[in-house]
Every structure is written in C-alpha cells, then in structure tokens.
Regions:
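N-terminal capping segment at the start of a domain
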Residues: 2-35, 125
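A non-catalytic alpha/beta surface segment that caps or lines the substrate-entry region
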Residues: 23-69
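Buried hydrophobic packing segments
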Residues: 45, 98-108, 241-244, 248
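Catalytic-core environment of secreted peptidases
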Residues: 52, 64-96, 101, 216
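Short helix-loop-beta-strand segments that form the rim/entrance of peptidase-like active sites
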Residues: 108-129, 254
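Midchain, well-structured core segments that form catalytic/ion-binding scaffolds
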Residues: 126-127, 131-254
C-alpha cells in the first residue's frame, strides 16, 4: 500500500473541539475520569468513530473500543490512550493519541482502503488516577495487575465508588467486550519534557517510561533547647531529612 497523508488541519480541529470539553477559566482542562466532562468527551469520540462506520463497544471497566475491520480476521493493531485528565491538564495528553489514531482511520476510510489486520482504537478509563487511585486502573485490570472487584471498590474524595461512577455515566459495559488479543499496541504521546525540543527532533521512539514509587520515611529526632544545646549534641530530624532529600537526585543519575 502506498503512503497516505493525513489531514493535519482536521486533526488540529478535532483536538481543539475535544479541548473545549472541561476547559477551565485559566486555560487548563479538567476532565476527571467518569465525571460529566469525561462522559461528554467519550460521547464526542464515540460519534466521530460511528461516523466512520466503526463498531464501538464498552467493557465492564468503561474502556471504549472502536474497531475498523481488516482484510483478515486477525488480532488487531491497537491504537490507544485516554480522554481523562488531571485538574487543569493539557489539551494533548491522552487525547492526541486517540485522535491521531482516529485521523489514521479517517484517511483509510476516505481512500477506501483497509489494512490486513483490523485496527482498534481504545480509550482506557481512569488512566490519570486523578479521581480514582491508582493511575492506569482499568488497563491494570486488563493486564492482571488488579482484580475487577478491587477496581470497583476504589472511591474518590466524595466517597463515590468506581463502580457507581461507571453506572452513573452509562459506561459500564460487558466483560465479554474486553480486548483479548492484539498484534501490537501503538500510542502517540506528547513528550511532556524538553529533550526533543532541545535536540531539535520532531519525534522519538519510547524505550522506557518513568516508574513512580512513593516511599514514606519516618525520621525521629530528639527535642531539646534550641539555644543551649551544642550542635554536636543535637539530633535534629529536619537536618537529617534534608540530607536524605539532597542525596536523592544522585540516585536518579546514570
């Protein structure tokens, strides 16, 4: 198959339209998972997919799949990301990965072409973890990291459970709709860092991502008179904590 060019103006306009959902006064975007803003974004994305004749389904975790048939019934090429954001998030984090995949399908439809394998777009629920901790909750269940019941029991700050939020938004589908097999997974994402810009490169291939680890450390000191206790006889917890903190950057260097 010869190369097919996308329509960059249409891609940009779709990103702009999506960014209007949850837009805040300071220019950020707030579409926390399974809120009304997230629901509106999902419905917009669903309408775009259905305009192309794609089959849209939702699994029991709220993950959305939009399928474009291939020439053969083989495991699909997955192109995915997420539509939920953190509070006052950016316009491209997550949304770009999905809408770029959508644009690829758009040009395939316009040219009357199909790939050998099916293409499936997937919108993962609660990727950010800004409403229901931890992040990547729904995809974590698919990967076997969490049990479904464990995910359902997660609550937000208002005490609303993940399960109830799925039901309230109308995005609790069936377990049989989960993705079972895939030939590969592709996700376009903004870098969110300075490396590409500084190296004057337009695109990079991700070989690894940062893994977040939260550690709680208790440092115990001894309270004493601040003016009369000699420095060599002090046990100041804050001083020790500052020494610990100052050593952390060195651990992250190669």
């Amino acid at each position: 198959m010869e190369a097919i060019d996308i329509n960059p103006l249409r891609l940009t306009e779709s990103l702009r339209e999506m960014s209007m959902i949850g837009k805040s006064e300071n220019g950020g975007i707030s579409r926390l998972a399974l809120t009304d803003e997230d629901r509106k974004a999902r419905l917009l994305f669903k309408s775009w997919c259905e305009e192309l004749g794609m089959d849209v389904r939702v699994d029991d975790l709220g993950n959305m799949y939009a399928a474009y048939e291939g020439l053969k019934d083989e495991p699909p090429i997955l192109i995915g990301s997420h539509l939920d954001t953190v509070e006052n998030g950016g316009a491209y984090d997550g949304a770009y990965g999905l809408i770029a995949g959508l644009e690829a399908v758009r040009v395939l439809v316009e040219s009357g072409k199909r790939l050998t394998r099916p293409v499936e777009l997937v919108n993962f629920t609660n990727e950010e973890g800004a409403r229901f901790e931890p992040s990547m909750l729904a995809s974590g269940v698919l990967a076997g990291r969490y049990a479904k019941e464990e995910a359902y029991a997660k609550t937000d700050r208002a005490g609303i459970s993940f399960l109830k939020a799925l039901e309230d938004t109308g995005f609790k589908g069936e377990q049989e709709n989960r993705i079972r097999h895939a030939s590969c997974y592709i996700e376009l994402h903004v870098e969110q860092g300075p490396v590409l810009e500084r190296s004057r490169r337009q695109i990079g291939i991700v070989e690894g991502v940062a893994g977040l680890t939260c550690v709680e450390i208790a440092i115990k000191g001894t309270a004493n008179h601040a003016g009369t206790t000699p420095m060599l006889m002090r046990y100041d917890a804050l001083v020790t904590a500052s020494n610990v903190i100052s050593r952390i950057p060195a651990l992250a260097l190669p």
